Amino acid sequence: MKHIFIVNPAAGKSDRTAEYREMIDAAFAPRGLSYELLVSGAPGECRTLARQAAQSGEEVRLYACGGDGTLNEVINGVVGYDNAAVTHFPGGSGNDTIKIFDDPAAFTSIERLLDAEEARFDLIRCNDSYALNVLSIGFDARVGTDIARFKRLPLVSGKGAYILSIFSNMLHGLTADYTVTLDSGKVFSGRKTMICVCNGRWYGGGFNPVPEAEPDDGLLDVLVVEKVNLLQVATVVGHYQKGRLSLIHISEPTRP
């Protein structure tokens, strides 16, 4: 098997490429194994590098070194290639995807990633792209778009950037008109705050909107958040973060 590490030097708050190389060398040298380390130079290039590796036809394990966005790019690069497996060596600010698994700490050890068995997981398809974890639409998606600029602030964590972006976007309107149709035939239409399609459970620096979601059960868990006003936002965000929106009757988690 070929081992390829794809590094996003822009992930997190500093370039960790040299640190990654030291850790990889320490794990691979005693085993007499070789590897390649590829560094992305532009947004979207991790996907291109992953696709090129998969197209070689060799059995390959790709290690996405960066944040959740880096992992997403690498996954999108290998969809449809059975010779390629993907894992994650986290180096972002949120690193939420690994929280799907029983032992997230295992992903911080190169040795344990080398020894790990492969498993198959579901993906969310949106137009021509795929997601492993969560797909959000509406207010939350706008919040996610603005997170990057808040992450640049000193002493702001991934979760802190998410919270700041929430309150910034509150000033630009909370709702929009949507129609959501599930495979079951159930339809949600009208003014909605956001729609969250969950294959995994954690995102946004620690938000857990649907605790029941499992990435290998063949189902997507859909959470539709109804229209809320500014006075409700703080309560909604708190319940949304903890996966308790159904308790305040403004959402309906369903499985298509």
Labelled PLM ranges:
Residues M1-L62, N72:
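ATP/NTP phosphate-donor binding region
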Residues P9, C65-G67, F89-G92:
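Glycine-rich beta-strand-to-loop/alpha-helix junction loops that act as flexible
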Residues R31, S40, G80-C196:
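Catalytic core of DAGKc-family lipid kinases
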Residues M194-K242:
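Internal helical hairpin/lid segments
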Residues I248-P256:
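Residue-level detector of conserved catalytic or cofactor/ligand-binding positions
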